[in-house]
Amino acid sequence: MPSASKNFRLQSKYVFLTYPKCSSQRDDLFQFLWEKLTPFLIFFLGVASELHQDGTTHYHALIQLDKKPCIRDPSFFDFEGNHPNIQPARNSKQVLDYISKDGDIKTRGDFRDHKVSPRKSDARWRTIIQTATSKEEYLDMIKEEFPHEWATKLQWLEYSANKLFPPQPEQYVSPFTESDLRCHEDLHNWRETHLYHDEGRTGVRHPSLYICGPTRTGKTTWARSLGRHNYWNGTIDFTNYDEHATYNIIDDIPFKFVPLWKQLIGCQSDFTVNPKYGKKKKIKGGIPSIILCNPDEDWMLSMTSQQKDYFEDNCVTHYMCDGETFFARESSSH
């Protein structure tokens, strides 16, 4: 007998039960269910047996009530030590066809052809999508509300779950050691003061860092070697945003294609983003960004004077000199 569950609640006039590997007699189970549900004005009951290949017997039951129950005890339907799987019957005709496929079924009462309307079904799906907070919870809610879809379309449901709740990517590990790289004194000061700062200092908005320089000089390699970060190249998508990162990297993305640039550059906290194929979410933020670009896509050339004012107030700007590189060894070519 399962332990009591505070979360269990059955409020459906149409119920589908399955008793796996049950050694009881079908007629005894039938009589038990009919008497148990009489207070709820039962008007149809069907109990069918199914012989599995392993030689065990499963019993299925379709229950139709005239009065909606509110059952909080998960052991309510337990019979002779057998606990059933309990599901709302979304489509009574479909359930009846399924349980009677072997022909061994006992019924009583007048069957009603019932199924959830498409509008109500859409509303249930919408609720699941809007309220689930993780992939596991999303799939569990579907299994509870739509067991048939869960059993027959799990592969597609997992695909949608991964879109809504994408797995966190593996943390980047730099292939270079600290001795392989070097940086300008200004960048060293920014790193030590604003990136490797004392985390106990709260309420401080640290400036971001803007580096504009030629290709193949090690800008990306150096930036990615500094610690745990979010990395965006080509486009910004918050789907896999890492809340535990200590900084962001915006690499080779033109200024006009950077959404929420003030929030990212200004080290702002608690702002709402809209990931691709996902639902809006609030991210903690509060971390600086490193912007990397080549001279042909210098952000300053695309900004208005007001945008430049905000940018310069919230960002340390570094234009690389001729011959400047982030590699300490000439043999490096990344």
From Swiss-Prot:
This is Replication-associated protein. Its main location: host cell. A divalent metal cation binds at E50, H58, H60, D102. Essential for the replication of viral ssDNA. The closed circular ssDNA genome is first converted to a superhelical dsDNA. Rep binds a specific region at the genome origin of replication. It introduces an endonucleolytic nick within the conserved sequence 5'-TAATATTAC-3' in the intergenic region of the genome present in all geminiviruses, thereby initiating the rolling circle replication (RCR). Following cleavage, binds covalently to the 5'-phosphate of DNA as a tyrosyl ester. The cleavage gives rise to a free 3'-OH that serves as a primer for the cellular DNA polymerase. One of its GO terms (cellular component) is host cell nucleus. Residues 236-254 are annotated as: Transactivation. One of its GO terms (molecular function) is helicase activity. Its cofactor is Mg(2+); Mn(2+). Residues 9-111 form the CRESS-DNA virus Rep endonuclease domain. Belongs to the geminiviridae Rep protein family. InterPro entries: CRESS_DNA_REP, Gemini_AL1_CLV, Gemini_AL1_REP, Gemini_AL1_REP_central, P-loop_NTPase. A motif (RCR-2) lies at residues 58-60.
